[in-house]
């Protein structure tokens, strides 16, 4: 019943199945007609889902950089010149074991395995570091998805607001895309409430101020057509997306970037 109530609230933002144009004040034309054009700098910020983990402690499931690989491939195919930025060492630092396979394409080999995804982190931890990350990476886009590890705690929504506040203060020209976070494999009311606050309160507040902040709905990517959570889209049917789930996420991020920052036509 709670899930049904969530789904009855109309989305006001971008999602993969029906991407609507971003507000005109957020749209820009991107001139990238030759190799000398400046790459679009993209900072992916979040927890283990941003790093690309699966619920797979023995790493028997191949590691494919989570949504970041699919996003990179889509951007490249569309003609964008991009550079992912960030300094997280995960998952290669061995904190949760090291992937056994060699992903293909290997984003490390082409200098694109750059992000700020940190396994187990919550909004408070990201808040402590976001100033440093923005100052160092100087992003054009910030893809922010954080909160699954503390959505049930009262400070989470306020922390998220403070994170976005710090980003727009330090880098007002950057586009900040705040994700409504993915669910766990079983419905959790606190996540539904957290996402509602992102969609209906946080993002509209920043938009009224003229900030380049919008949202995407990553939650719906993990649902069945009837609106219930799809366990088959989770690795080991637990909490992290599997390859199909991550691909859906990649498409949603791509749709947002393309809508906000379309390539100029020749």
Give the residues covered by each predicted segment:
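Sec-exported extracytoplasmic/periplasmic mature domains
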Residues: 50, 54, 72, 76-80, ...
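Catalytic His-Asp segment of secreted/periplasmic serine-dependent ester chemistry enzymes
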Residues: 107-110, 115-118, 182-266
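Extracellular low-complexity, Gly/Ser/Thr-rich intrinsically disordered linkers
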Residues: 125-126, 139-141, 146-152, 159-167, ...
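Extracytoplasmic, non-cytosolic globular domains
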Residues: 66-70, 156-206, 253
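Conserved SGNH/GDSL esterase-like catalytic core that processes O-acyl groups on lipids
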Residues: 52-159, 187-196
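N-terminal secretory targeting modules
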Residues: 1-89, 127, 261-266
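Structural recognition of the beta-strand scaffold that forms the well-ordered cores
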Residues: 41-46, 50-51, 82-87, 140-150, ...
């Amino acid at each position: 019943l709670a899930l049904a109530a969530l789904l009855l609230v109309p989305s006001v933002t971008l999602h993969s199945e029906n991407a609507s144009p971003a507000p005109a004040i957020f749209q820009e034309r991107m001139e990238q007609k030759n190799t000398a054009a400046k790459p679009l700098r993209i900072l992916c910020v979040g927890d283990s889902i941003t790093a690309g983990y699966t619920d797979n402690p023995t790493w028997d499931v191949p590691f494919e950089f989570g949504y970041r690989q699919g996003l990179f491939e889509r951007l490249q195919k569309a003609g964008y010149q991009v550079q992912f930025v960030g300094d997280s060492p995960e998952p290669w630092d061995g904190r949760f074991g090291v992937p056994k396979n060699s992903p293909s394409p290997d984003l490390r080999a082409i200098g694109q395995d750059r992000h700020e995804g940190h396994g187990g982190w919550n909004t408070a931890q990201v808040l402590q570091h976001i100033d440093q990350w923005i100052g160092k990476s100087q992003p054009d886009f910030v893809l922010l998805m954080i909160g699954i590890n503390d959505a049930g705690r009262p400070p989470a929504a306020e922390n998220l607001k403070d994170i976005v506040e710090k980003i727009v203060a330090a880098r007002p020209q950057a586009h900040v895309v705040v994700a409504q976070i993915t669910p766990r494999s079983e419905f959790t009311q606190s996540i539904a409430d957290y996402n509602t606050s992102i969609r209906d309160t946080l993002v509209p507040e920043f938009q009224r101020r003229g900030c380049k902040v919008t949202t995407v709905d990553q939650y719906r990517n993990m649902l069945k057509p009837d609106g219930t959570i799809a366990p088959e889209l989770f690795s080991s049917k637990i909490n992290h997306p599997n390859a199909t789930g991550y691909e859906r996420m990649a498409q949603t991020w791509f749709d947002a970037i393309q809508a906000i920052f379309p390539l100029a036509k020749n």
